Amino acid sequence: MNAYIDTSALAKCYIREPRSLEVLDWAEGHGETATAALTLVEFRCLLARRRRAGDIDATLERMALAEFDNHVRSGSWRIHHGSFGDFATARDLIDTLPNHPLRAIDALHLAAARSCGATHFATADKTQAEAAAALGFTVHRFY
């Protein structure tokens, strides 16, 4: 079974939030799980945004980032580097799913999941979940 996790769900593995334990259990149960290379930047941005908002402190920010980086280096997350074709696919998804208000990063995650052959898609974003379901993914919702 090929699984993909977007940044909204992946973040729950590093920051205690509602449904965090469920995401961890899901990830452990799916073995090799892919995420897009853009998650490296998006997750870093998420941590900084949460620190600035006062949701986490600088220590937790550093610890979460270090743990994530260790997981990336060890292969716990399979980073899908993609290609120009993923950007073209993401662009096309805006037209393919006209009733889903996809943001650019949402479309890129969906394109990456398709490109790496995922059949399962984990997200904590309702709009993303609906779009993934419309594309035929088995969606695992963590919101």
Task: Annotate each predicted stretch with a short phrase.
Residues 19-21, 66, 107-110:
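A generic local structural motif
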Residues 77-126, 130:
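Active-site neighborhoods of divalent-metal-dependent phosphate/nucleic-acid chemistry enzymes
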Residues 44-93, 134:
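Active-site-proximal, substrate-binding regions of enzyme catalytic domains
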Residues 1-41, 46, 50-63, 135-138:
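Short, well-structured N-terminal submotif of metal-dependent ribonuclease cores
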Residues 26-28, 72-74, 115-116:
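Short glycine-enriched loop/turn motifs at secondary-structure junctions
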Residues 3-6, 102-103, 125, 137-143:
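Histidine- and aromatic-rich ligand-binding microenvironments
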Residues 37, 81-83, 143:
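Residues at the C-termini of beta-strands that transition into short coil/loop
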